[in-house]
């Protein structure tokens, strides 16, 4: 009975240790499924550590297996103790010696099997973290280029006073350009019913009408091209799994902005076709400056979203998949450490504020264009011989609609003098903000902690702000020539692009990119251990 009492615990412990060691070599399907989930990353790390211990040698593997079971630890503790007991002490002692030798042989065989099979056994792969493909980034840059083009064409359409030449909004029929003489005359007759023709353009010929019609038609066709070009590839991206986590929602948001942009365009044109609206605008046949600013602002938002999302996705891919540094930094560690630093964080806030300022200045330019405010006070730096116009011109009761004159704020958006003055002040503020940011970034201890690309983009923003300010002054002095004014509008978008790129260069990696980078580093370490 005594021998059975000794044999059963020791044999059970040895068998338990052997089963535990053997189970390390091949994961069950449930474990493999668990490892492929997000929570399985920790399980995969444990498997990688086990593989390292097993490949390090039978001695270390014996310790790892022994640590996994209390019964196994008792066996190894017994095996590791020095043999001070005499073999001939007693029959019970001899039996214990035989059991110990058997347990040692059984466990050693199991460990050897685990060690030899560790290199060929299949451990669960780490879960794949989907990242937005570089193909999507290039696609967004193409859309951004098309938006840039439509902003320029839209500026030319406004400057040539062509925006009211097409009096209908037909998404399908509007694609067809009039071809025959009869079709052109039919469109011309429709235009003759508009307030613009009755008040300003009774002198134009059919050939003149064709010219302004082509500008508006080109603007609308380019808008349709942008819509189709944006929506068409999305099903493929979803099917081919080219989109990372949250990317589809971002694309849906941009698509919504594009749709709102098209609707706002027609809503803006309607304000210039309706006679009552024209009377509300002072009897001048032009579109509402509020709707014009909203139309331009939506275009800038679409452009900004495409540029920022495209750059962010490209940076995440480069960091997590290629494991390369960003912004001129050479290593991943240097990139993450730099972007998490206080200097990068402070600069990120400054660049974000500057981006908002550039955007606001561009919107104020839309009010200048909508009110033809560039045709007054065509001098610089003064306005009527002073740095600012007389106060009674800035705050007129004429623009108030309430009897108590409590809506004087309308002067900010409806008084041409106030609108031009505001645009000047915002332009000065933007210029000196860019200069201040450059002087801040060029300080040696600041520059050394910023990505080299960020400094170059800030420097480029400084150069572009000088050019943009010069274009604005020249446009004012020469009474708003068409091509110069269109270049000034395009310059605002170039400046916004540089500031957006500077902000994107300071963007910290997304959570998805960090997770993908962590798994890539684990795979790299596992490959080194296997070798």
Regions of interest found by a model, annotated:
Residues 2-8, 12, 27, 32-531:
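Polytopic transmembrane helical bundles with strong interfacial aromatic enrichment
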Residues 11-19:
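N-terminal alpha-helical interaction modules that lie
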């Amino acid at each position: 009975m005594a021998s059975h009492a000794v044999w059963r615990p020791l044999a059970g412990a040895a068998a338990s240790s052997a089963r535990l060691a053997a189970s390390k070599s091949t994961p069950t399907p449930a474990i493999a499924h668990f490892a492929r989930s997000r929570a399985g990353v920790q399980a995969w790390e444990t498997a990688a550590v086990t593989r390292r211990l097993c490949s390090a040698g039978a001695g270390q593997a014996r310790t790892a297996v022994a640590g996994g079971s209390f019964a196994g630890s008792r066996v190894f503790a017994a095996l590791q103790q020095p043999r001070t007991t005499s073999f001939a002490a007693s029959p019970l002692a001899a039996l214990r010696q035989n059991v110990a030798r058997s347990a040692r042989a059984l466990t050693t065989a199991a460990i050897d099997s685990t060690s030899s099979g560790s290199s060929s056994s299949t451990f669960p792969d780490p879960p794949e973290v989907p990242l937005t493909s570089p193909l999507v980034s290039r696609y967004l840059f193409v859309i951004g280029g098309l938006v840039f083009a439509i902003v320029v064409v839209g500026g030319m359409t406004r400057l040539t006073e062509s925006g009211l030449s097409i009096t209908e909004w037909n998404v399908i029929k509007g694609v067809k350009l009039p071809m025959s003489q009869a079709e052109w005359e039919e469109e011309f007759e429709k235009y003759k019913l508009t307030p613009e023709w009755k008040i300003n353009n009774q002198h134009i010929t059919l050939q003149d009408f064709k010219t302004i019609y082509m500008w508006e038609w080109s603007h609308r066709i380019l808008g349709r091209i942008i819509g189709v070009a944006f929506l068409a590839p999305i099903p493929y991206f979803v099917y081919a799994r080219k989109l990372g986590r949250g990317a589809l929602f971002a694309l849906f948001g941009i698509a919504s902005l594009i749709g709102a942009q098209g609707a706002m365009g027609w809503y803006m044109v309607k304000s210039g076709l309706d006679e009552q609206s024209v009377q509300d605008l002072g009897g001048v046949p032009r579109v509402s400056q509020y709707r014009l600013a909203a139309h331009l602002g939506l275009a800038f938002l679409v452009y900004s979203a495409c540029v920022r999302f495209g750059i962010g996705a490209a940076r995440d891919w480069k960091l997590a998949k290629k494991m390369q540094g960003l912004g001129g930094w050479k290593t991943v560690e240097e990139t993450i450490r730099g972007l998490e630093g206080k200097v990068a964080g402070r600069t990120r806030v400054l660049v974000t504020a500057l981006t908002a300022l550039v955007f606001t200045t561009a919107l104020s330019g839309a009010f200048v264009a909508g009110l033809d405010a560039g045709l007054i006070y065509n001098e610089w730096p003064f306005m009527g011989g002073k740095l600012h116009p007389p106060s009674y011109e800035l705050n007129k009761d004429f623009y108030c609609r309430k009897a108590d004159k409590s809506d004087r704020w309308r002067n900010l958006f409806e008084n041409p003098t106030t609108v031009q003055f505001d645009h000047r002040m915002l332009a000065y503020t933007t210029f000196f903000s860019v200069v201040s940011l450059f002087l801040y970034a060029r300080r040696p201890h600041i520059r050394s902690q910023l990505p080299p690309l960020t400094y170059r983009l800030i420097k480029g923003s400084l150069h572009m702000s000088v050019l943009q300010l010069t274009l604005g002054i020249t446009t004012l002095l020469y009474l708003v020539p068409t091509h110069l004014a269109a270049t000034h509008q395009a310059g605002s978008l170039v400046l916004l692009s540089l500031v957006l790129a500077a902000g994107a260069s300071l963007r910290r990696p997304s959570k998805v990119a960090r997770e993908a980078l962590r798994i890539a580093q684990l795979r790299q370490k596992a490959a080194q251990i296997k070798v």
